[in-house]
Structures are given as structure tokens and as C-alpha cells.
Amino acid sequence: IGIGAGYLFKTTFQREATSDLTGERGSLMGAIEGLLEAQYEVLREHGHSPSEAFNETVEELTQSLMPLFAEKGMDWMYANCSTTAQRGALDWAPRFREAIKPVMEWLYLSVKTGNEAQISIDSNSKPDYREKLNAELKAMHDMEMWRAAETVRELRPENEVK
């Protein structure tokens, strides 16, 4: 039995470990970080301000679209977005899938063969693991994209000074 998102589901240890590690490195964390950073960088390289690039990359995703997606699914989210968003998403999704699927296959194989578990074991076993992790997290925190996040979050209605 696996536990996920507040419910139980039937699985095996091998399937749960494989899907869990693939998900964490893939769409749940690693891939989403890479995707968001790539889009942010492209917008910045083409003259968009940090706040604008962050808003169009992360803020709208987390504040507007993901709640719709979580509530009733991708098709419902599409049906409740602008026509330009609908058409663009439907046209571009296959291109992203074609570009990303080979990386996901490579990742899955790396997980299935135990390579990803070994990387984690080796990394987590080093005496300076925590210091290196903190340095990596600080580097992420200090990126322009995440500094812009602080500015954009201050603009949310719930953060408005009354």
C-alpha cells in the first residue's frame, strides 16, 4: 500500500520506489524547476522585467492555473482559460512532450537500475552533505528569479496592507 496525496493505493515496494523517485526528479520537482527556470531566462533575455517574467512563469501557474487543474483536471482548466491560452497549450503540448519524453525515459531507467538511489546514498552519506545542500539551496534562493518572487508575492491581495 502506498500513501499519496491523502489517500491509499495498492502498489508494490518496487513500483512505489520507482514512481516516487521518478516523480520527485521529474514533474514534481526537478523537471518543473528546470522548465520554470528556462522560461524565466528566455523572458529575461528578451527584455522582460524580473517581476513580469516571474509572474508569467510561476505566479500565474501557482495562483491561477494549478488550483483549477487540481480541482477538476487539465481539460477543465483549459475550458476555463482564455482562448489564446487554450489554443497555445493544445498546439505546444505535443512539442514539449516530444522534447521531454526522452529525458523522462532516461530518468526512469536511471531510477529503475538503482543509479538514482545510489546517487542519493552517496551524496547523503558525505560528512559535508548538509553544508553542500545549504549552499545549493542558498544559490537557488539568491537567483534573480526567486528574488523577483518576493516582490511579486508582496503584490498578492492577501498581502495588501489595510
Per-segment meaning from a language model:
Residues I1-Q63:
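Internal alpha-helical scaffold of NAD(P)-dependent oxidoreductase catalytic cores
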Residues E45-K162:
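NAD(P)-dependent Rossmann-like dehydrogenase/reductase catalytic/cofactor-binding core
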